[in-house]
C-alpha cells in the first residue's frame, strides 16, 4: 500500500476533528487550561506592555481556537483572527460569543495568501508561523496586511524545535509541519518581504522562568535564596545575550 502524500495544510484543517472533545475543550479554555499557562500569560502580558493602547487593530494569523485573539479583544483591541481550519474558527466564534461586546471577528483562510480587505496596526504570529508550508509567503502576506509603520510580533519556537518529542509526535499523529523558526530566520524572511528594521528580544516567559522560580519556595534559608536569585539573574542575562536563536522578534514595515 502506498503511503499517502504528506499534506500539512490538510493536517491543519483536520486537526481539531482529530483531537476529540477533550482536546477541543482544552483549546477553547487556553491559556488557563494549559500546563504552560504561566508562559502564555508572561508573553501576552509583555505584548500588552509593548503595544500602543487601544484603539488599535490586530491581525492574529494562525489563531487556532482564537484564545490569543479573544485575550487581546478583552484588553480593548479590535482583532481579526484567521486560521486555515474551519473547525478552529467555529470554536473561536463560539468562545467569543460568551463575552458580548468584544471587537473580534474570525475568518477561515490561509495565512500564506491572506486577503483581509483592510490594513492593521499590528500582526501577530503566536506559535503559528512554524506550521507554515511556505513561511516566506506567510511573512510577505503579513507585511502586506500592515499599515505603513505597522509592526509584526512573532513568538515562535527556536532552533531544535522540530527534533523534540512533542513536535515529532504532532507530525506523526496529525500530519502538520513543526519547523524550527528562530528569530534570525524570521528576519531573513522579513527582509525579503520588505520589513525595514527588527528587534530581537528574549521570550518574556524565558526571562520569567529564570528569575521567578519554584526553588525559592523549597528552601527558606537566606543565603540559599540569595544564591538562587543570583543564578536566576545570570540565566536571564544568558538568555538576553542570544535572542536571535530563540525568543521574540519585532519587525517594522
Question: What are these model-predicted stretches?
Answer:
Residues 112-122:
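A short acidic, Gly/Pro-enriched loop at the edge of an enzyme's catalytic core
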Residues 114-116, 167-170, 199-253:
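A C-terminal cap/extension of S-adenosyl-L-methionine-dependent methyltransferases
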Residues 85-87:
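Conserved SAM/SAH-binding beta-strand->alpha-helix loop
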Residues 92-93:
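Conserved SAM-binding loop
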Residues 136-148:
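A short glycine-rich, Lys/Arg-flanked "PGG" loop and its adjoining helix->strand segment in the class I
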Residues 99-112:
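Conserved SAM-binding strand-loop segment of SAM-dependent methyltransferases
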Residues 1-53, 153-175:
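Conserved class I S-adenosyl-L-methionine
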Amino acid at each position: 500500500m502506498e503511503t499517502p502524500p504528506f499534506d500539512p495544510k490538510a493536517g491543519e484543517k483536520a486537526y481539531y476533528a482529530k483531537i476529540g472533545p477533550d482536546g477541543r475543550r482544552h483549546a477553547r479554555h487556553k491559556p488557563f487550561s494549559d500546563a504552560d499557562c504561566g508562559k502564555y500569560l508572561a508573553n501576552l502580558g509583555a505584548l500588552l506592555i509593548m503595544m500602543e493602547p487601544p484603539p488599535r487593530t490586530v491581525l492574529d494569523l494562525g489563531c487556532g481556537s482564537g484564545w490569543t485573539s479573544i485575550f487581546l479583544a478583552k484588553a480593548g483591541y479590535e482583532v481579526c483572527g484567521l486560521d486555515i481550519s474551519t473547525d478552529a474558527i467555529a470554536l473561536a466564534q463560539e468562545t467569543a460569543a460568551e463575552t458580548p461586546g468584544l471587537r473580534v471577528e474570525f475568518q477561515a483562510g490561509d495565512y500564506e495568501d491572506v486577503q483581509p480587505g483592510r490594513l492593521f496596526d499590528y500582526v501577530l504570529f503566536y506559535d503559528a508561523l512554524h506550521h507554515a508550508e511556505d513561511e516566506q509567503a506567510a511573512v510577505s502576506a503579513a507585511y502586506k496586511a500592515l499599515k505603513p509603520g505597522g509592526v509584526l510580533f512573532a513568538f515562535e519556537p527556536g532552533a531544535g524545535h522540530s527534533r523534540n518529542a512533542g513536535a515529532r509526535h504532532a507530525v506523526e499523529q496529525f500530519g502538520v509541519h513543526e519547523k524550527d523558526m528562530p528569530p534570525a530566520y524570521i528576519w531573513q524572511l522579513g527582509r525579503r518581504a520588505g520589513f525595514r528594521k527588527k528587534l530581537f528580544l528574549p521570550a518574556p516567559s524565558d526571562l520569567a522562568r529564570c528569575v521567578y522560580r519554584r526553588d525559592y519556595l523549597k528552601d527558606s534559608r537566606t543565603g540559599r535564596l540569595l544564591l538562587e536569585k543570583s543564578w536566576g539573574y545570570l540565566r536571564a542575562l544568558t538568555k538576553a545575550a542570544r535572542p536571535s536563536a530563540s525568543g521574540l522578534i519585532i519587525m517594522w514595515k
